[in-house]
Amino acid sequence: MSVKNAMTAEFLRSAYGGESMAHMRYLGWADKADKEGFPKIGRLFRAVAYAEQVHATNHFVVLNGDVADTALTAGAVFGMKETAENLVGGIMGEEHEVEQMYPVYYEAAKFQGEKDAMRTFHFALQAEKQHAELFRAARECALAKKD
């Protein structure tokens, strides 16, 4: 697979960076949840971290590994807080991807005829909707001090 259009390639690199960072952030938040007595929330963070790794890998494959000489940043929440607040950070990140990032990336790829990019953006968008819902439910549990 490869991408012919610079804009779609840039969007894939951006998504790759964001998903990679989310993967690592969620693993850290999983450990924090475990330490706070929320092992189920910890498992949720780990499951979503794995999904984010899959998204990053899919974006990377579509790029055909073309990320050399590219600085990747993501404007996502950074840091470690209490589990309920970490879940807010997760919700915000997932909602950004659902409401802004992936719809724009998908439409650009569609306009440019980049079918492989369309596919990876579509699948990520659908998964991110579920992640946001799961994080919302988990936050309610954390606020109620239930796991």
Regions of interest found by a model, annotated:
Residues 1-147:
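Non-heme di-metal
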